[in-house]
Amino acid sequence: MSGSSLPSALALSLLLVSGSLLPGPGAAQNAGFVKSPMSETKLTGDAFELYCDVVGSPTPEIQWWYAEVNRAESFRQLWDGARKRRVTVNTAYGSNGVSVLRITRLTLEDSGTYECRASNDPKRNDLRQNPSITWIRAQATISVLQKPRIVTSEEVIIRDSPVLPVTLQCNLTSSSHTLTYSYWTKNGVELSATRKNASNMEYRINKPRAEDSGEYHCVYHFVSAPKANATIEVKAAPDITGHKRSENKNEGQDATMYCKSVGYPHPDWIWRKKENGMPMDIVNTSGRFFIINKENYTELNIVNLQITEDPGEYECNATNAIGSASVVTVLRVRSHLAPLWPFLGILAEIIILVVIIVVYEKRKRPDEVPDDDEPAGPMKTNSTNNHKDKNLRQRNTN
């Protein structure tokens, strides 16, 4: 073997060896965790979710197990629908395996160790095999504490009249943990200037309107314990605060109309079109109407506008348990030639002006024009000339 061919042969042999060590697309790969469940502390009545993400080839199977506090060796498998349907297990398999364990309406008995197990061993479910060898495990500890008792005022309904001040109240009556501070939130956002260290809380709305409605929470934070909160609902009929009064489009274009409102609970939205003065629910037989509803917002999209069908008045209606409201948007659809109308108008004016000029010039000319070949004055005849010649001859004779 020559010296020049030795490095090439060595490189090829190294490539073959390294290729045999790397797992190919169909090669087996042991299960491994990408994401493991995390330990949490919760209050009674709350809920928790644990996530488990595993890889391997073939895709590993995932199971959830549970052991009570101080009984770490007494694991029992958890199934979807267990504990009076408070347990939900959602698992999906693809290139990897992903599973979510969710338990709602927690009780003190839900405390314990939760374990995610994964395996792609062909003998993983053989009872004669040792599970600690065929399955990999990831654990999380869930601690459930007794929720503090919070007494709240009743829900409030805002009326148009009379407009009276509203006072929301919360009172923390019992807790096994030391309070650090408390505050109010509306729809999940902390209200300014409400944070204090007090178990008895009040929030006053002097002139309540529909925009003041929503979910109010009094939130309490403790030392070495999860925060606790209570909810007070402030309800009001919908008040539509924004919409398009009119929409002008050309035939074949798309039109978008929208409405947004304040008020709580979030309304049910309905779009109607007025036919002969009567609002009629929109029937999407043509497949050109698309409606998007999201809490206090709705949107109507019409594609490929038709000048004979789509123009008119469109009404959006918002209705909740307290009341309803509606507004109208006028849709105008112009012809394809609409952009040419200014040009056509100017062209028509020019044509009319030319016609007027031509008619005027024709009327200005005389009815008959004399020919250039005709003499301008009367001509002497030959008879007159002959008569003169005769007189001349007669004088010469005498």
Swiss-Prot record:
Tell me where the signal peptide lies: 1-28
**Membrane topology type:** Single-pass type I membrane protein
Keyword Disulfide bond among record annotations: yes
Record: glycosylation sites: 171, 197, 229, 284, 296, 317
Q: Region labeled Narpin — which residues?
A: 149-161
**What Pfam families does the record tag this protein with?**
I-set, Ig_3
Q: Which residues form the Ig-like domain?
A: 29-134, 148-235, 238-329
Segments carrying the region annotation (Disordered) are 365-398
Any one Gene Ontology molecular-function term assigned to this protein's record: type 1 fibroblast growth factor receptor binding
Extracellular-side stretches of the chain, per the record, are 29-339
Kindly list the cysteine pairs connected by disulfide bridges: 52-116, 170-218, 259-316
Q: Which residues lie on this side of the membrane: Cytoplasmic?
A: 361-398
Q: Which GO terms describe its biological process?
A: axon guidance; dendrite self-avoidance; excitatory synapse assembly; homophilic cell adhesion via plasma membrane adhesion molecules; intracellular calcium ion homeostasis; long-term synaptic potentiation; negative regulation of cytokine production; positive regulation of cytosolic calcium ion concentration
Q: What keywords are annotated for this sequence in UniProt?
A: Cell adhesion, Cell membrane, Disulfide bond, Glycoprotein, Immunoglobulin domain, Membrane, Neurogenesis, Repeat, Signal, Synapse, Transmembrane, Transmembrane helix
Q: Where in the cell is it found?
A: Cell membrane
GO CC annotation, single = immunological synapse
> Which residues are listed as membrane-spanning?
340-360
Q: What is known about the tissue distribution of this protein?
A: Isoform 1 is ubiquitously expressed. Isoform 2 is expressed in brain cortex and cerebellum (at protein level).
Oligomeric state and interaction partners are given as: Interacts with ATP2B1; this interaction stabilizes ATP2B1 and increases ATPase activity; this interaction controls T cell calcium homeostasis following T cell activation. Interacts with XKR8; promoting its localization at the cell membrane.
Q: What is known of its domains?
A: Some isoforms lack the first Ig-like domain which may confer homophilic adhesion activity. However, they can bind and activate FGFR1.
Role summary? Probable homophilic and heterophilic cell adhesion molecule involved in long term potentiation at hippocampal excitatory synapses through activation of p38MAPK. May also regulate neurite outgrowth by activating the FGFR1 signaling pathway. May play a role in synaptic plasticity. Also acts as a chaperone for ATP2B1; stabilizes ATP2B1 and increases its ATPase activity. Promotes localization of XKR8 at the cell membrane.
PANTHER family of this UniProt entry? BASIGIN RELATED, NEUROPLASTIN
State what protein this is by name.
Neuroplastin
Upper classification of the source organism reads: Eukaryota, Metazoa, Chordata, Craniata, Vertebrata
